[in-house]
A protein has these predicted regions:
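Conserved non-catalytic scaffold segment of RNase H-like nuclease domains
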Residues: 2-143, 156-177
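Acidic two-metal-ion nuclease catalytic site recognized across multiple nuclease folds
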Residues: 2-30, 191-267
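Acidic, Mg2+-coordinating catalytic module of metal-dependent nucleases/exonucleases
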Residues: 115-135, 156-229
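A substrate-engagement module of RecA-like helicase motors
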Residues: 250-251, 256-257, 270-278, 336-338, ...
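Conserved pre-motif I regulatory segment
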Residues: 264-312
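Signature of the SF2 helicase/ATPase Hel1-core->accessory helical subdomain module
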Residues: 350, 442-443, 447-471, 475-614, ...
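A contiguous, basic/glycine-rich beta-loop/short-helix subdomain that forms a polymer-engagement track
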Residues: 436-470, 480, 485-487, 615-759, ...
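Conserved RecA-like P-loop NTPase helicase motor core
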Residues: 746, 758-769, 821-924
């Protein structure tokens, strides 16, 4: 494998050249004491969980310089049988371990071999946790070095840091999923990592070695030794950023506002791009032209030419991303402008950035420049990073400080070898570090007070590069944050594709919400601190010996006092919110209470107002005193109060949001409060949400945009775009400025998808009868399908009750049924569902859309209850107060679209087939039921008595298996 193919896109040439010589230099370079008497170790186990699995093999090698001078290898006899998949992966059989020593015996022998020397392992936490779970395992070594984390520091631009990838790349022994072979591979990679560390900017090793010396950190001796090889070297992050940015130059782009009309390919040229042998065919040799895709591409082209908007519902299989990419890329290239694509999901953004756009760039003469742009909190803040590395700020005590130092080292190395990039690609686990320690927000950014602003900064550098790119890929969240920030986040982009557009109203409402949160308030006051902690304490220490310190310290003392009062006052507010939450009806875990006329006129609310007004006054006093301190110090020492100024703005925002909600007279908003019933304290919040998102988009965003292409597979209700057009404001800007287009899927839904309506299920309001009948449907369906069933619930209570009833019956039948329990990871549930073809899943909202499991993995989707919003939902209550037919205008079409999204989980390729079971009797008993059925991708459905559903599914399954 060539180094060029092994590094991330955009890696500077000097980094590629350095990586290319590592293997050769590792053969001759010496590192003295740090490679004497070190142990390289690997284990094999019966699985990934230390609670449920056991060791089956341990291998270790003692290194002296470049030589292995001693070895330790043993099988381990587990108490459980080795699973077949582990035997297939490792070739270790139950016969191999039958006469092996027990785990206690093997680990004791390992401890004797190691003798307390440092241990190197790839993903050392895994190996260490298994070894130390055995009696005596803690005696093996006190020093464990994770070569996975070290490789991210030494080689930050590698596309992968898997041991097998690096071993192959640098010509080391191959990985074979056997402990002894993997140890040999790591012995070779270890020396490569040491050489790579010496290639990082001079002085960086010393900076890392000296970082927070009071924190025990296994990498410190390595960095300290390497720093000693270049004594006196001074590290400059600013200089390192300047070096890496030397070759990062781009042409300026034109603001499309300056162009009277766009130069675009003709319709015939667009059609040729999608014809056999055309542009798209060159990108994908197996591509076959689709009439629906060509029609969409032409519609997008016409919208760009005329400067108008389009709403395009493109069914599954149309290939909508390639339909808009080609005309949008041509618009950017021919007019020297930047165009934008906003997606909801990371999956689609990654598909565009790492697959479709690179392939398109390869086939276009002159190429195509593109970049991804994310929110501020995805990028390292270099000012914070610099202060952290110099020990000028405290490490968050709630996390392992060693993990924080490792994260600082990884980020430092990355920004020294990367012109741009974000935290998401660095393998830093969110649960291991406090991300706000390394990131900033738009309202917190120091901008001109920051030594890295603008060009050396990753946030503003990304924005600058976006302004020079042909295509910018971002997400709905950032797009709407940019609208709220009046365009200060994104470059001026006048032509947009809003993909996955069915969810943008909800996302805009979320992004524009004004929230007063107990958890965020607690974090804010922790950051402010007081006499001994936080930003106020830091300012006191920084100013203690300054000229004028008496004045400054007096202002600091006043600010500390008012902040303490404000902290107590806002805590009283959240106590009151929790009491008000007792009035909420419904909600299993969370109470969501509308702050409507009835509540505002109650005695409870009037009692609550006393603490609310007191908090507003205390917050305003704290805001004034902190701002006075910031203004006084900023005149002479602005760098001292940068962080405090950031926090002060948050304090002001908290006061303003609380005033807005308590006052409640701004009719643009609906007001509500939230309480987590499972917690005795914490989790309380108050929220003001925009009611009419369409009005806001029509006045604040669409006038700034020449062309917006709204695309999704789920937009119409009974073939009508009326609901969507109202939701995004297109019905407020004139009929001539936009048009809609429906494109049928290229898949044969009528043949491959069956829809079953259970016609005799009791009304859900008769809960026990309903659950009993639904239990029978679920059991029969799972048994008939043999697994591969996804059941989508609207509330946790029903899901957990039915899981308790159904799961034991599935277990007795040898079928696996999982449930989206509290705090469970949706990603892990998804991966488990996909990896086990016969498993089934009970799930909530996270799985109603965006969950793809093609083929035999998913053959049946069951929707027990139509997903109407709760009658007590604050937005629904506010709409009902203002409009007579609000339920039919909003709640009904929103539920129809959610069912369409859920149905879309079934058919993800032309060969997929499956059954959708709708078990809500209202589809039959209510007139609105037809809206759901006529909106589905197949026009045919069958009404079947619930007792016959299992038999029907058996026949359906047999018929489709014969077809294959």
């Amino acid at each position: 494998m060539l180094i060029e193919d092994a590094v991330s896109s955009g890696t500077p040439q000097f980094v590629i050249d350095s990586y290319a010589t590592l293997a050769e230099r590792a053969k001759t370079q010496s590192f003295g004491l740090i490679e004497e008497d070190v142990i390289v170790l690997d284990t094999e186990t019966t699985g990934l969980s230390v609670q449920d699995n056991e060791l089956i093999e341990i291998s270790a090698a003692r290194l002296s310089g470049r030589e292995i001078v001693d070895r330790f290898d043993t099988f381990v006899h587990p108490k459980q049988l080795i699973p077949a998949e582990i035997t297939e992966l490792t070739s270790i059989t139950n016969a191999d371990v039958a006469d092996a020593p027990s785990a206690v015996e093997a680990v004791a022998a390992l401890a004797d071999f190691v003798g307390g020397c440092p241990v190197i392992a790839h993903n050392a936490t895994f190996d260490r946790s298994f070894i130390e779970s055995v009696k005596g395992g803690v005696n093996v070594s006190d020093i464990w070095i994770d070569s996975l984390a070290l490789s991210r520091i030494a080689l930050p631009r590698l596309a992968s840091h898997k041991l097998s990838f690096m071993a192959d790349l640098f010509g080391c022994d191959s990985v074979s999923h056997r402990a002894n072979a993997d140890v040999d591979a790591l012995c070779g990679v270890w020396r490569v990592l040491l050489v790579a560390l010496t290639d990082l900017p001079q002085g960086l090793m010393a900076r890392l070695a000296d970082m927070h010396p009071d924190v025990p950190w296994s990498y410190r001796p390595i960095f300290s030794f390497l720093a000693g090889q270049n004594p006196g070297s001074i590290f400059s992050l600013s200089a390192a950023r300047a070096d890496v940015l030397k070759a990062d130059r781009a042409d300026d782009r034109v603001d499309a506002d300056e162009l009277p009309v766009l130069k675009m390919p003709s319709r015939e040229e667009i059609e040729a791009d999608y014809a056999p042998g055309g542009l798209v065919n060159r990108m994908y040799p197996t591509y076959e032209p689709r009439d629906e895709q060509i029609a969409m591409a032409l519609e997008v082209r016409d919208a760009l030419v005329t400067g108008t908007h389009r709403v395009i519902e493109a069914g599954t299989g149309v290939g909508k991303s390639m339909a808009y990419l080609v005309p949008f890329a041509e618009a950017a290239r021919r007019n020297n402008i930047t165009v934008g694509i906003a997606t909801k999901s990371n999956n689609l953004a990654d598909q565009l950035m790492y697959h479709e756009l690179p392939k398109l760039a390869e086939q276009l003469d002159g190429g195509l420049s593109f970049c991804a742009l994310k929110g501020y909190d995805h990028y390292p803040c270099l000012r914070k990073l610099e202060r952290m590395s110099r020990g000028q700020v405290e490490i968050t005590t709630k996390r392992d400080p060693a993990d924080t130092l490792t994260a600082v080292a990884v980020i430092m190395a990355y920004v020294c070898q990367s012109a741009d990039g974000d935290l998401d690609s660095l393998g830093i686990r969110r649960r291991s570090v406090n991300r706000p320690d390394f990131t900033t927000a738009s309202r917190e950014c120091a901008r001109r007070l920051c030594p890295f602003f603008p060009d050396k900064c990753l946030v503003h550098g990304a924005r600058r590069r976006a302004a020079h790119a042909d295509v910018v890929v971002t997400n709905h969240s950032l797009l709407f944050r940019n609208v709220a920030a009046e365009g200060r986040i994104l470059p001026p982009i006048r032509h947009w594709v809003i993909d996955e557009a069915h969810s943008i109203e909800r996302e805009a409402r979320r992004q524009w919400a004004r929230v007063v949160s107990a958890d965020e308030s607690r974090v804010l006051f922790e950051r402010l601190g007081g006499s001994s902690t936080g930003a106020l304490s830091q300012v006191s220490r920084d100013l203690a010996t300054s000229e004028g310190s008496t004045l400054y310290l007096g202002l600091t003392a006043k600010a500390t006092s008012t902040v303490a009062r404000a902290s107590m006052a806002i805590a009283d507010v959240f106590d009151g919110v929790r009491e008000l939450g007792r009035r909420a009806r419904g909600g299993y875990d969370n109470a969501n209470l509308w702050i409507g006329p009835e509540l505002r006129e109650s005695d409870d609310w009037h009692d609550f107002l006393q603490s609310a007004y007191a908090a507003i006054d205390a917050l305003e006093q704290a805001d004034k005193s902190v701002d006075a301190l910031v203004q006084a110090v900023a005149a002479d020492k602005p760098e001292v109060v940068v962080d405090l100024g950031d926090i002060s703005r948050r304090l002001h925002e908290l006061a303003e949001n609380l005033k807005l909600i308590i006052d409640g007279t701004d009719e643009h908003y609906v007001y509500s409060l939230q309480v987590n019933r499972r917690l005795r304290a914490g989790g309380e919040s108050m929220t003001a949400e925009r009611i009419d998102i369409g009005e806001a988009l029509a006045t604040e965003w669409l006038p700034e945009v020449h062309t917006a292409i709204f695309a999704s597979a789920t937009m119409t209700v009974s073939k009508s775009f009326e609901h969507f057009n109202h939701a995004v404001g297109l019905d407020r800007i004139g009929a001539s400025t936009s048009s809609s287009l429906h494109l049928d899927s290229s898949y044969d839904f009528d043949s491959n998808m069956a829809v079953v309506v259970a016609g005799d299920i009791p009304d859900p309001r008769d809960r026990e009868s309903y659950l009993t009948a639904l239990e029978r449907v679920l059991v029969d369906a799972h048994l008939a399908m043999g697994g591969s069933v996804l059941t989508l619930f609207t509330n946790r209570r029903d899901m957990e009750d039915l899981y308790a009833r159904v799961e034991p019956k599935m277990a007795r039948a040898g079928l696996e049924l999982n449930c989206q329990q509290r705090n469970s990871s949706p990603r892990r549930l998804r991966d488990r569902f996909i990896s086990e073809p016969t498993s089934s899943l009970f799930a909530l909202k996270a799985f109603w859309e965006g969950f793809d499991a093609s083929g035999e993995t998913l053959r049946c989707v069951i929707i027990p209850k139509l997903p109407f919003s709760s009658p007590t939902d604050p937005l629904s209550c506010e709409r009902n107060l203002r409009e007579d037919r609000a339920w039919a205008r909003y709640s009904l079409p929103e539920a129809v679209l959610e069912v369409k999204q859920a149905a879309g989980r079934l058919i993800r390729s032309s060969t997929d087939c499956g059954v959708l079971i709708l078990a809500d009797p209202r589809l039959v008993t209510k007139g609105y039921g037809k809206k759901f059925l006529t909106s589905l991708p197949t026009s045919s459905y069958q009404r079947i008595e619930s007792a016959q559903i299992g038999h029907y599914l058996q026949l359906w399954r047999a018929r489709h298996e014969r077809r294959r």
